[in-house]
């Protein structure tokens, strides 16, 4: 009898595991929604923008940071230059495909770094500003897909699990409007399912090329009260000269 109960329990566990598996149709739908979020955004081809950050940490005064970003999304090229504060002016990052360097204008040296690196002293990482619809299928598996509501919006709720070392977090959950594929909320988790970070995007602006998340709030869930607000401005979609995506460009700014 005991052996029978153990065997029955194992069968029930296996059955529940199979039942809990996500269907291929939901996997395909989830990836399609994630890719649609990239298509809906205005960032296609060449663009530049000013990124202003307000960093809040308990017991410290607010810190203001400002960067200029240049990106050529089709070729995975990106240059990020710090404009403020004055003491850090000229610091930057350069991306060419999977190679990423940080630049220090004082030592005039480039250091190979990771897309997981935080920008300045903020809660924003380099991969947060990367625009690429190819990154979803290449770097994630779909763990769950469902529909629900967030505030007044019906949303897709998609949980992705990292399958490469590229993503900054082991798991991320996205809340995406069903009428227009815009991400309203993102929750990032550790490998043990601990909530590490929450991103809220309360404001989008419509421009001819698509939508732009002009106001973004990033909360550090490990350090309560610590958050970064990001504001996007001065967005342009003019063709950028090739030299902007070179080490010589960063070196020539100072």
Predicted regions and their residues:
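Sec-dependent N-terminal signal peptides
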Residues: 4-14
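Mid-chain, structured segments of secreted extracytoplasmic proteins
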Residues: 65-105, 112
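Gly/Pro-enriched, hydrophobic low-complexity segments
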Residues: 111, 131, 151-247
